Curated annotation (Swiss-Prot):
Pfam families: DNA_primase_lrg
Family: Belongs to the eukaryotic-type primase large subunit family.
Entry protein name: DNA primase large subunit PriL
Binding site for [4Fe-4S] cluster: 302, 375, 384, 389
CC cofactor note: Binds 1 [4Fe-4S] cluster.
CC cofactor: [4Fe-4S] cluster
Subunit structure: Heterodimer of a small subunit (PriS) and a large subunit (PriL).
GO terms under cellular component: primosome complex
HAMAP family xrefs: DNA_primase_lrg_arc
Free-text function comment from the UniProt entry: Regulatory subunit of DNA primase, an RNA polymerase that catalyzes the synthesis of short RNA molecules used as primers for DNA polymerase during DNA replication. Stabilizes and modulates the activity of the small subunit, increasing the rate of DNA synthesis, and conferring RNA synthesis capability. The DNA polymerase activity may enable DNA primase to also catalyze primer extension after primer synthesis. May also play a role in DNA repair.
Single biological process term from Gene Ontology: DNA replication, synthesis of primer
Disulfide cysteine pairs (residue numbers): none
The species this protein was found in: Methanopyrus kandleri (strain AV19 / DSM 6324 / JCM 9639 / NBRC 100938)
């Protein structure tokens, strides 16, 4: 399993044989239902997920992990998009638990809900270990507050602290940012204040070592926001973000970890498991066929690559989303079909995405249909795979005559 911290302890998710995975099918159905994929109302989704968290918090811990292992095995036997739906569901439940811990009163810290959050979602992302029933942070864990008296920053740093202590501070509305530090200084996790991306390592110089090298912001963030720099006078190098950004980054880390764990079981080939998986997610096959059918040889390499990344649930930067959506609407895809392409992204919001795609298509706003960026701009944004296609715009690649056109 990929980790920002190579030497961090991990919770062992048990390997499950296909036959045993099938024996957990009822509990897996319950877990999948808890994701509430079919519910449109966000509050209903959160309510459903929290109900499931309450259900499992009193279960035996090893049994919870076995059910989770069975879920990963089922996902590994199904079509590729399933693993990203599973990962999105797990990350959504993790985020729900994180918000629950933030907003509950202090007595909530004694509830097993903390155990569920830590064991299933935080084992690698925030470097936790079990120690006499507590969870300790291996690296120092700073939390940056805005003091009630004014604009000064208050920084709390623990070399070791129980998760209980850290989350008590995280629940405070005064928290502005978090950075996880390695004592050596070379395994620090930096969180980009613009896009929420995480990156490991560095010298500690915010502008030179992070802002200009963030792959998601390449080409558009030449230096940090001046307002951000003003807040970084003490101590220099800390990145500031609001709790929503922390939650989004945390959710993306969880999603990546779950996908990685599922992919480690890629050799699972069991027809019964596969059929069970397809019954759980009947729309997966149709969605996959629709996306792949449109991504034929006429699509340029850059667009095929962006389609692949979107289908796999990668958190695409804004420029990549715009380029992909603008290309698809200009080759005749309808709005709903384009929105469907982005549905696996970790921060997918159907209503917002539909509005943005309609705006690109010229259906709302000023009525202007936007063209995809030209190849020079795609290269500047880091979206060109490097192959010289001999055109100046992705649409030219799509429209040029081919031998099989007759």
């Amino acid at each position: 399993m990929r980790s920002w911290f190579p030497h961090a302890p991990t919770v062992s998710v048990p390997e499950i044989e296909p036959e045993e995975a099938l024996s957990y099918r009822d509990e897996i159905r319950t877990r999948v239902r808890s994701y509430a994929f079919g519910l449109d109302d966000w509050r209903a989704k959160v309510k459903t997920r929290r109900a499931y968290l309450r259900k499992v918090r009193d279960e035996d811990e090893s049994e919870i992990l076995r059910v989770y292992g069975a879920l990963l095995t089922v996902a590994a036997a199904g079509p590729r998009p399933v693993r990203h739906l599973i990962a999105e569901g797990e990350s959504a439940m993790a985020e729900t638990a994180l918000y629950a811990l933030r907003h509950e009163d202090e007595s909530a810290m004694s509830y097993p809900e903390e155990r569920v959050l830590s064991d299933l979602y935080l084992w690698d992302v925030r470097v936790l270990e079990r120690d006499l029933g507590l969870y300790a942070v291996h690296f120092s864990f700073p939390l940056i507050h805005r003091s009630p008296e004014g604009q000064k920053l208050k920084v709390l740093v623990w070399e070791r602290a129980s998760l209980e202590k850290v989350l008590k501070e995280v629940r405070s509305n005064r928290v502005l940012g978090v950075r996880v530090l390695d004592p050596s200084g070379w395994n620090d996790v930096w969180i980009c204040p613009r896009c929420g991306a995480t990156r490991r390592g560095g010298t500690g110089d915010l502008e030179q070592d992070h802002a200009r090298r963030c792959s998601n912001c390449r080409g558009r963030m030449r230096k940090p926001d001046p307002n951000l720099l003003e807040m970084l006078k003490e101590p220099e190098g800390y990145l500031i973000m609001h709790f929503k950004t922390l939650a989004r980054t945390f959710r993306e880390d969880v999603r990546r970890l779950v996908v990685s764990d599922i992919e480690s079981r890629d050799d699972v080939e069991d027809e019964e498991l596969r059929e069970f998986c397809l019954k759980l997610f009947p729309k997966v096959r149709k969605r996959l066929e629709r996306v792949e059918k449109g991504a034929g040889g006429r699509f340029p390499p850059c667009i095929r690559e962006l389609l692949r990344r979107a289908q796999e649930g990668e958190n695409l930067p804004h420029e990549a989303r715009f380029a992909l959506a603008a290309f698809l609407v200009n080759v005749g895809w309808d709005v709903d079909r384009v929105v469907e392409v982005f549905s696996n992204l970790p921060d997918f919001d159907e209503e917002r995405t539909q509005y943005q795609v309609r705006h690109i298509a010229g259906e709302v706003g000023g009525g202007t249909r936007y063209l995809p960026p030209n190849c020079d701009k795609m290269k500047a944004w880091g979206l060109c795979p490097g192959k010289d296609c001999g055109v100046k715009n992705p649409l030219a690649y799509y429209r040029r005559p081919r031998a099989d056109d007759g």
